[in-house]
Regions:
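A cross-family acyltransferase "interaction/gating" segment
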Residues: 125-127, 174-251
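Catalytic-site beta-strand/loop segments enriched in glycine and acidic/polar residues
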Residues: 156-184
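Catalytic core of membrane glycerolipid acyltransferases/transacylases, capturing the structured
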Residues: 42-54, 58, 72-73, 86-143
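Residue-level preference for the first positions of well-ordered beta-strands
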Residues: 90-92, 159-165, 193, 237
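Soluble, non-transmembrane catalytic domains of enzymes that act on hydrophobic metabolites at membranes
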Residues: 1-20, 73-83, 101-103, 115, ...
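A membrane-cytosol interface segment of integral membrane proteins
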Residues: 136-157
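A transmembrane-helix-recognition feature enriched in membrane-embedded lipid enzymes
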Residues: 15-80, 128-132
């Protein structure tokens, strides 16, 4: 029987060499940047030459394969928890938000439509790609525009699942901010379940939560990409939770759905951080 080894670090105690994070060599990073731009160009070509003539199944195949390769370039391993609970029919997925990588980690598992902040649409190349993939863009802090987006989402949910990031911003992933309930109305209108997703990024070396992928503050996209390439060997962990069961005493409305999803993620992150 194989026994595990547990390291307990005390003050002034050094980290075992095997667990020290190693920075990616410059020459390797240069090659990875070349691989990224080649991969982006291949994605643009696919969007131009394949997507206009492809059915949904074919588009999903290309999206998944493109995302899998992107994660590989960045040295990110995908780990799923409870993926079998997701249904084959449409649903709304509510997730915490840490990084631009979140979208690609989810798509590498199972392609889905996203709702993203309107600023993403203005990103060079990547904004255009997101638009071609059917991303629904929302203006933050605009309740009027949110109402229009809810109508668009409910129409999309008739044939495809949709993922939202109800925090309205990204965080380092240590905790989850309160969820804004507006977009949950789309699931109520479409009479579809709301599944919850908790995202964490972990260091392969230590198994602990990593801030490296966090896309926060005034950080630019290229700056974030460079930071991740410099500190590769990460794990993107996706943990799925089932929808709540509505009762006559507690009907399913957007505020209740938002609160339930938030509590699931908050509880999970809190327990994970204490391990």
């Amino acid at each position: 029987m194989t026994q595990g080894i547990c390291f307990i670090l005390k003050p002034n105690m050094s980290i075992p060499p095997a667990f020290i994070e190693k920075e990616t060599p410059f020459i390797t990073r240069f090659g990875l940047w070349m691989a990224i731009w080649a991969h982006v160009l291949s994605g643009v070509a696919t969007l131009f030459m394949v997507f206009p003539f492809a059915n949904l199944k074919t588009r999903h195949f290309h999206i998944q394969q493109w995302s899998i390769k992107l994660l590989k370039i960045f040295g990110i391993q995908l780990r799923m928890m409870n993926p079998g609970i997701l249904p084959s029919n449409s649903y709304l997925l509510a997730s915490n938000h840490i990084s631009w990588l979140d979208i690609h980690a989810i798509n590498a598992f199972k392609p889905i439509r996203f709702v993203a902040k309107s600023e993403v649409e203005k990103w060079p190349i990547f904004g255009w790609m997101a638009k071609q993939l059917g991303t629904v863009f929302i203006k933050r802090d605009s309740s009027r525009h949110a109402h229009l987006v809810v109508g668009e989402m409910s129409a999309v949910l008739k044939s495809e699942s949709v993922c939202i990031f109800p925090e309205g911003t990204s965080t380092i992933g240590e905790a989850v901010r309160p969820f804004k309930p507006n977009l949950f109305e789309a699931a109520v209108m479409a009479d579809l379940p709301v599944y919850t997703l908790a995202i964490r990024y972990l260091s392969k070396a230590t198994g602990q939560r990593s801030d490296v992928p966090a896309f926060v503050g005034d950080m630019g996209l290229l700056e974030s990409m460079s930071k991740i390439l410099k500190n590769r060997n990460l794990i993107a962990e996706l943990t799925f939770f089932p929808p709540p069961a509505a009762t006559p005493q507690q009907p399913s409305d957007r505020k209740w759905l938002a609160l339930h999803s938030h509590e699931q993620i908050a509880k999970y992150l809190s327990s994970s951080n204490t391990l």
